[in-house]
Amino acid sequence: MLLDKLAFIENKYDELSVKISDPSIMQNQNEWRKLCKEQADLEIIVNAYKEYKQVIEDLQVNKEMLSDESDREMKEMLNEEISSLAEREIELEKEIQILLLPKDPNDDKNVFVEIRGGAGGDEAALFAYNLFRMYTRYAERQRWSTEIMSLNETDIGGFKEVVFMIKGNGAYSKLKYESGVHRVQRVPDTESSGRIHTSTVTVAVLPEVDDVEIEIADKDVRIDVFRASGHGGQCVNTTDSAVRITHLPSGLVVSCQDEKSQLKNKEKAMKVLRSRLFEKAEQERADGIAADRKSQVGTGDRSERIRTYNYPQGRITDHRIGLTLYKLDSFLDGEVQEMINALITADQAEKMQKMGNTEM
């Protein structure tokens, strides 16, 4: 029963409240901060549970009053109150079930977004730029900050590849569903016959990880330095400031030339490498899960075609949940929250189904 689990969580919350008020624990700041975070994670569940208990109590009181009431107007008022409380009871049950779902430990983290042009040549590179702009505009709407880690541009303004960081609370929880193949259908500017071309762009969203989560030994990396280049390979720096890091055990390679400082480029490249190694380990773990238990929504398979952007129809279709929106211009301007909310809801529904019995 979920009620038993909720009672246990409430007791745990109360125990933590006592502990964080203990002067002896407060002296150990690391332990105190850990307990405060643990309590904060439980607070929203406890508050919902307390409201749920109050609603149940109020319902019972109003029903008892109704059975003893003879005045017609009072009966109408009580019936309205009972109806309102019953609706809130159902809402809270759904909210609590979602709150009790296992939390992705990466949800609160910053992210690295990697966008690469796929099939389609110049058109794919141009659409890679469109997606980069879409995500940065969305980040602005969320009051998040962005920072380019590495960039490989084309002569016509497209991106062969761009890796950038988005810093903000809950960034991974909202953007993790964007990993996969994005397909675009449109008429290129150079197409005189008006024929629609199909191109693809690959997006990968990686949570930022720290040194403790992924340790990289010095002996496992080879660091090469070279001069940064701009459009068409032209040199834009007279010093060897660009950095290429090769992780020897895995073969992963990360380059960064965005900064003028070699040290800063190395720091950025190491951050990206650490996140790629983390994702690789997570993917290997996920591959070990039986196929029938894998998520339908998906948050990590780069080869999965997840979405189509059709310019002639002004349409965006997400193939995982079958949702189609007809607002392509505003979507590409960063108004993607409706799609993200739908993906989160679908993911939550699937997880609740896997949990089985969710009766209160």
From Swiss-Prot:
Q: Which Gene3D superfamilies match?
A: 3.30.160.20, 3.30.70.1660, 6.10.140.1950
Q: Where in the cell is it found?
A: Cytoplasm
HAMAP family annotated for this entry? Rel_fac_1
The UniProt keyword set, sorted, is: Cytoplasm, Methylation, Protein biosynthesis
Say yes or no: keyword Cytoplasm present: yes
Residues modified as N5-methylglutamine are: Q234
Membership in a protein family? Belongs to the prokaryotic/mitochondrial release factor family.
Function of the molecule = Peptide chain release factor 1 directs the termination of translation in response to the peptide chain termination codons UAG and UAA.
In the record, what terms sit under GO molecular function? Answer: translation release factor activity, codon specific
**GO CC terms in record:** cytoplasm
Top-level taxon: Bacteria
State what protein this is by name. Answer: Peptide chain release factor 1
Q: What's a Pfam family this protein contains?
A: RF-1
In terms of InterPro entries, this protein maps to:
PCRF, Pep_chain_release_fac_I, Pep_chain_release_fac_I_sf, Prokaryotic/Mito_RF, RF-1
User: Where primarily located?
Assistant: cytoplasm
What happens to this protein after translation, modification-wise?
Answer: Methylated by PrmC. Methylation increases the termination efficiency of RF1.
